[in-house]
Amino acid sequence: MTRIFKHDILPLIKERWSPRAYSEEKISKDDLYAILEAASYALSCFNEQPWRFILADDEKTLTKMRSILYSGNLQWAQKAPVLLLIAAKKTFSLNNEENFWHMFDTGTAWGFLSLEAQKRGIITHAMGGFSMSKARKLFKISDDYEIVTVVAIGRYGDISQLSDDLK
């Protein structure tokens, strides 16, 4: 993949992309908690921090998380040692009024998370191809939360193990 940048931007942004070849190598708790902590420092309206994470890094939770993925994503994401479901609280904690910025703020948190991961040599790939209704039921997510994405997190793997259409 060749990308041409017209301006001088942060190297982390230049280097970041969403590969599909994952190694099964475990991610250390220190690295995992650091990338989650980076997300916690994302800017948000009234510092609400509406994002919520459901972390799957053990086999039982990974199996559950994989079961919500559509087959196209499951083909490659099944090797990722961590899957992270991201949801956004739709109302403010203070007054239960609608937070019109919940998705914008949650996207900012995802961006911070992905850049911290990149800095640590960890790859991330956000997916839209999963069953939101199944996720809501399996993980008991209330209607006050909007399910945003599932993110594969891990180390870069062997691209030759992917089918040609996924390379």
Residue ranges and their predicted role:
Residues 1-167:
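Acidic, surface-exposed loops and disordered segments
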